[in-house]
Amino acid sequence: QTGAQLYTVRSYTQTIEDFICTIQKIADIGYKAVQLSAVSKQIKPEQIREICDRADISIVLTHSDPERILHDTDALIKEHDILGCSYIGLGCMPDKYRTKEWLSHFISDFKEPAKKIAAAGKLFMYHNHNLEFETFAAENLPNAAPNRRILEYLLEGFAPDEMGVTLDTYWVAAAGADVCDWISQMSDRIPCVHLKDMKVKNWQPVMAPVMEGNLNFSAIFHALEASNCKYLLVE
């Protein structure tokens, strides 16, 4: 199913009036699903669910505050029950964990909430950027080696029922990695995928709408058909 990532229209989700209008416009385009990201905290889960239900829109994924995932897990799960949402997402690894000294702490810190989320019948989802393709010999983790990627440590540190990956096509490509290869490697871990293209402007890679850049989406879609992907979220 194709859905919309609301982060793209975050400027128009900061009041309940704007949120109602934005969801209706998304429904009018033909989308049947959304990911909640950067929506105003003043809009309550009950209100969000009611507005989306009226527009026949399902809420399939969120990006949630890492502190809430860590320290307010039970309440966060209940909010996702209200939203009718099974995937509780982390938008980005907090800065402090992104080193060889601290990566093991990310796995140990998020393991407990990930297990709680799984026990509630939901799944903790990790959204990649390009930073997860940095390589180093992580401290206090098994199979550490200088050429191992952060993403590989995460996949080893969390079981498939503890962590899924919201694979982002742009950011995989921005890391110089093969998007189709990583779809294949994580085929049982990617129920949600972010679709965005990449083009070049002034010698720099920049984000672009799908099919307006240089990524091979014909091959990407073919690879996704062989995976467990359920939701293609356009960003």
Q: Positions of the model-derived regions?
A:
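Structural preference for beta-strand elements that scaffold enzyme active sites
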Residues: 1-3, 33-35, 56-61, 86-89, ...
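A cross-domain feature marking catalytic cores of carbohydrate-active enzymes
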Residues: 4-8, 36-38, 61-66, 90-92, ...
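Glycine/small-residue-rich loop that forms an oxyanion/phosphate-binding "nest" at active or ligand-binding sites
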Residues: 71-105, 109
